[in-house]
């Protein structure tokens, strides 16, 4: 039913890599054909016509610590965990401070570090909320499906518990999305398909529960 669809969409959203899209990487504008997308915990780059080769991959992976890069012909496909980007800027700040630079001299770098680390926290909150919602959506789906198959494994859950599980599926997804949004650093990125899918999963879960509460199944 609707809760099962919410479960599938929730999984697609939490595991997807395109909650936000941008035309910039680390403050630099990318070429028109390049794609920069942000998931909850990592950013992804697809750069066609980049003359990708082993030397390019080695150089980028050495500079951008933690970044995973592969070539598809001339196309560069890169994934960089938000936590690794946070650490990258932190190491950069330490390097500049060791050189005697501080304050306004490295403000751009420290601001970038703050933003990258804030994105890590936002992604963590979003991930917890979405996964919590997905798990409850799975339980809610089983509560509806198993009795149809003659399995009474869920009968031990009291009615109030069933209501909490049903409302919690969409509620936790909503909470995760709200926390993620308000903890994100300011920027000009646009909504990606993953965010739309997450919104659909949350809306369907809440809608399914709302219908179940006010429209009895035998009517």
Give a label for each model feature.
Residues 188-200:
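Individual transmembrane alpha-helices with interfacial aromatic-anchor signatures
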Residues 1-20, 123-181, 198-216:
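Signature of small four-pass
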Residues 179-190:
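Membrane-helix boundary connector in multi-pass membrane proteins
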Residues 16-121, 188-189:
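Long, glycine/tryptophan/cysteine-rich extracytoplasmic
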């Amino acid at each position: 039913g609707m809760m099962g669809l919410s479960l599938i969409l929730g999984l697609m959203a939490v595991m997807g890599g395109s909650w936000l899209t941008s035309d910039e990487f680390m403050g630099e504008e990318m070429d028109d054909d390049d794609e920069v997308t942000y998931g909850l915990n990592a950013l992804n780059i697809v750069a066609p016509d980049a003359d990708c080769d082993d030397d390019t991959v080695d150089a980028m992976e050495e500079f951008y610590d933690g970044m995973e890069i592969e070539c598809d012909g001339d196309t560069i496909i890169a994934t960089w965990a938000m936590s690794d980007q946070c650490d990258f800027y932190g190491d950069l700040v330490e390097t500049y401070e060791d050189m005697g630079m501080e304050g306004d001299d490295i403000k751009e770098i420290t601001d970038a570090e703050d933003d990258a680390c804030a994105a890590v926290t936002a992604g963590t909150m979003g991930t917890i909320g979405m996964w919590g919602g997905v798990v409850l959506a799975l339980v809610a789906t089983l509560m509806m499906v198993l009795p149809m198959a003659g399995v009474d494994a869920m009968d031990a859950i009291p009615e109030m518990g069933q209501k909490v599980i049903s409302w919690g599926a969409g509620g936790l997804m909503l909470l995760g999305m709200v926390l993620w949004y308000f903890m994100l650093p300011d920027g000009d990125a646009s909504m990606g398909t993953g965010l739309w899918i997450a919104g659909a999963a949350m809306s369907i879960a809440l809608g399914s529960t709302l219908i179940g509460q006010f429209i009895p199944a035998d009517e």
